Amino acid sequence: MTLSPFFISPPSLQALRPTLLATAVLAALPWSAHATNGYFAHGYGAQSLGIAGVAIALPQDALVIASNPAGISQLGSRLDAGLTLFRPERSATVRGNGVPGFNGEYSGDGKKNFWIPELGYTRAIAPKLSVGLAIYGNGGMNTRYERNPFGAIGGQGRAGVNLEQIFVSPAASYKLNEQHTLGVALNLVHQRFSAEGLQPFAQAGTSSSPQQVTNQGTSTSSGAGVRLGWLGQLAPGWQLGATWSSKVDGSFHRYRGLFAEGGGFDIPENWGLGASWQATPEFTLAADYQRILYSQVKSVGNPLSKLLSGGSLGSSDGAGFGWRDIDVLKLGVSWRQSDKLTLRAGYSHADQPIPSDQTLFNVLAPGVVQDHLTAGFTWRLDAHGEVTGYYAHAFSKTVKGQGSIPASFGGGEADVRMKQNIFGVAYGWKF
């Protein structure tokens, strides 16, 4: 994609050419599982990720576009490029089932390592106007069960899903005055999805399109939405922020027999509030609140129990994964230890999106972790360059099924669990 000269002067376009080339390269890469709050990433940008994803009222690097585009007004001109190693551990247990061979432990770790790139660029083009571009993985989910959990009821080969979401977000911010800034980002979204080993659900009466439930290769979808942001300095040392992102329409045609509304898979609306307090020149405390509206997307929010009342997979109000809306609270601290070194730490907690009676289908998407702890640093190399690193640990969480397996599948319960370790590094250059 290109940015219109209406927004950027010719010298700025010249400076953007390497960024636009990187856009094309990054768009061609796989953007696999990348999630801690349901299937949304817990933050964007290495500096934010080191402080539990806090960013709405604490702009630190150019990836703030993904959280609050108003924040680019405080960054000047800079380029940030990062790479994350995401290592989830996901598994399931089936117990108390009456079908021979169904009970047991199943590992979804057929693929263990996921490399996730990100890129952000901002440029101040006028005293009150800044523009930018961010390329990042919004989220995703991956499971690969070499031993198919549904094998005893007709599943063939290995089982699992892979969901990838890449956002390309050009943005602009405008300073209304010294205290208040507004920002907007256009979210251009590309999604990819595949599923395999789900033959038990590819039956007449269970699916409206049984041939489009499983093993259809990779299906793609593109859509667009918008993110709005506000950043305000209300008192010395205090900043508040607010952000809202629209729903992005999506549909996986090859899996129109799996997802409700004929393959519909929208990215849900979400919004958030943030606050930061620079307690001293060295210490900053910050917090974010985020609300993700998973239940508004039928393929994600509708319960599997709709199968029992005519809501077959793929139908207009078909069965889904039964996810609930969630609230996320993020807390963090940044300490500028010296002119060279800044240290960060943070903690976040999210509601549980998966109810205990919805665990059977969520063997495929066990996004159950709720709490994670983070630490990070930035080392300033010189007046222009800096290196950032971070680590995040999502604590192990198990959701035990209660009334989770229908009698038609032999009854009993499915338990799902996950934990995550995340490592990242980024390089930033200030112009």
Predicted regions mapped to residue ranges:
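Bacterial N-terminal signal peptides that target proteins for export
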Residues: 3-20
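Outer-membrane beta-barrel pore proteins
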Residues: 56-58, 63-77, 121-126
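Charge-dense polyanion-binding interfaces
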Residues: 80-83, 87-103, 108
